[in-house]
């Protein structure tokens, strides 16, 4: 993924007929894959409380999701995805208010920054792409990921990647159109896999995030992060 792209996404709860519906809409199955994601944070969840999500995907590398523009409300989230390790390290140091660590590898700064593993799970994914009827051929395709985690939670995600904030409203309109075509209720929200993992296996951490969420002006973005979190 190109550095600095803005990810606009909406999560939903898929049903048994979701893949068939995607085919009816002209969607193409790109691949099926299984992977392990491991998430890192401080014991106090300082990153998550700041709406930052650090993940290492097995055989893929590091990614840090940072919040997008303020004031975008609705059953969706908007994040900037950082994948270049020096950029990730610089942002981590900024959020955690740490100086003097340079811009090296992410793994090298985990200890100095007090970051530790907080969640790790395996996901089975089917990845789809499609273009809505009437869309400009030069517009990026919409992506739909259907995930099932190894702890039994299934979630879908409609995603568009854009380069500038000015492109976000158009991306949102396309995401909402496709969601409607898939039968997703207009205001349905679905938590990210990581949030459900914390709720089930680290309830105290989950409660801590809920308390932070309740004090925010934009609660939706913490309630449905992640993919955060993919």
UniProtKB/Swiss-Prot annotation:
The record's cofactor note says: Binds 1 Mg(2+) ion per subunit.
Q: In which tissues is it expressed?
A: Widely expressed but at a low level.
Documented EC number(s): 3.6.1.28
- Primary subcellular site in the record, as a coarse category: cytoplasm
Result when mutating residue 79 to A? Decreases enzyme activity
Q: Where is the CYTH domain?
A: 5-201
What does altering residue 53 to A do?
A: Strongly decreases affinity for thiamine triphosphate and enzyme activity
Substituting residue 147 to A results in: Strongly decreases affinity for thiamine triphosphate and enzyme activity
Q: What does this protein need as cofactor? A: Mg(2+)
What CDD domains would the database entry show?
ThTPase
Q: Which PANTHER family match?
A: THIAMINE-TRIPHOSPHATASE (PTHR14586:SF1)
Concerning its family, UniProt says: Belongs to the ThTPase family.
Protein name per its UniProtKB record:
Thiamine-triphosphatase
| Species this protein is from | Homo sapiens
What phylogenetic lineage does the species belong to?
A: Eukaryota, Metazoa, Chordata, Craniata, Vertebrata
Q: What gene is this protein translated from?
A: THTPA
């Amino acid at each position: 993924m190109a550095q600095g792209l803005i990810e606009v996404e909406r999560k939903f709860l898929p049903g048994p007929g979701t893949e068939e519906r995607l085919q009816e809409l002209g969607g193409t199955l790109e691949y099926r894959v299984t992977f392990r994601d491991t998430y890192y944070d401080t014991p106090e969840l300082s990153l998550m409380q700041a709406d930052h999500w650090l993940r290492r995907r097995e055989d893929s590398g590091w990614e840090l999701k940072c919040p997008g523009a303020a004031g975008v409300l609705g059953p969706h989230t908007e994040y900037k995805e950082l994948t270049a390790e020096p950029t990730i390290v610089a942002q981590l140091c900024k959020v955690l208010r740490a100086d003097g660590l340079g811009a090296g590898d992410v793994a090298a700064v985990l200890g100095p920054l007090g970051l530790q593993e907080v969640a790790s799970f395996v996901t089975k994914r089917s990845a789809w792409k499609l273009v809505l009827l009437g869309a400009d051929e030069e517009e990026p395709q919409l992506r739909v990921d259907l995930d099932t985690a190894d702890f039994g939670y299934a979630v879908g995600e409609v995603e568009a990647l854009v380069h500038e904030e000015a492109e976000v409203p158009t991306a949102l309109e396309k995401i909402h159109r496709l969601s409607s075509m898939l039968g997703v209720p207009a205001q349905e929200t679905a938590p990210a896999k990581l949030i459900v993992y914390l709720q089930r296996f680290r309830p105290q951490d989950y409660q801590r995030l809920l308390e932070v969420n309740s004090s925010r002006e934009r609660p939706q973005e913490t309630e449905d992060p992640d993919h955060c979190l993919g």
